[in-house]
């Protein structure tokens, strides 16, 4: 039976979270299969992926220059545009009204830049992400806005379906 290694990434370069670092991880792991966070229905290869997920695309492209790996798209679906704009609106609102949210997001960014993939794949990152989500829920609870609640629930539902 094979080994499955899950590597949490970020879709853009940020300090030590870089395509070169991810490529080094891939070289150490030597995967036979790389699962791509992309719905099979829209998968058109790495060239197209580079527009939405440049970090992963660059690392995988570099890796397969010298190694063989099957690329398998596995995401469930692409969320509709209203979903994306609603989530952006919710996050923008929470950012405007919550210093705690901003501090947590800044901490997340700083840790990614300084510690890279070891942070992204560690327990402390999970704790920070949970604190960010809890702060979003707290702020939305204060607002009592149906459109924001629906947008947040759609976002959480999307995350749950993907997990």
Task: Map each language-model feature to its residues.
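Short loop/turn segments at strand-loop or loop-helix junctions that form parts
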Residues: 35-41, 74-79
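Extreme N-terminal starter segment of soluble prokaryotic enzymes
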Residues: 1-5
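Structured catalytic-domain cores with a bias toward divalent-metal coordination
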Residues: 20, 30-32, 68-70
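Proline-aspartate-enriched helix->loop->beta-strand connector
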Residues: 26, 30-36
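Short, acidic/polar
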Residues: 17-27
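Metabolite-binding pocket within alpha/beta catalytic cores that recognizes anionic/polar moieties
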Residues: 31, 41-48
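Hydrophobic, often amphipathic alpha-helical segments used for membrane interaction and targeting
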Residues: 48-163
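Short, flexible loop segments at the rims of nucleotide/cofactor-binding pockets, characterized by
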Residues: 10-15, 49-50
């Amino acid at each position: 039976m094979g080994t499955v290694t899950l590597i949490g990434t970020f879709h853009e370069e940020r300090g030590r979270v870089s395509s070169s670092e991810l490529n080094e991880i891939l070289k150490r792991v030597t995967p036979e299969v790389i699962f791509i966070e992309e719905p099979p229905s829209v998968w058109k290869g790495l060239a197209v992926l580079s527009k939405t997920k440049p970090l992963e695309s660059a690392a995988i492209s570099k890796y397969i220059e010298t190694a063989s790996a099957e690329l398998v798209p596995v995401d469930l679906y692409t969320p509709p545009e209203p979903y994306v704009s609603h989530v952006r609106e919710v996050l923008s609102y929470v950012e405007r009204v919550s210093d705690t949210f901003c501090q947590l997001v800044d901490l997340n960014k700083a840790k990614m830049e300084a510690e890279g993939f070891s942070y992204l794949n560690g327990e402390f990152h999970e704790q920070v992400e949970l604190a960010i989500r809890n702060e979003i829920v707290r702020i939305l609870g204060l607002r009592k806005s149906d459109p924001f609640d629906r947008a947040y629930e759609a976002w959480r539902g999307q995350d749950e379906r993907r997990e």
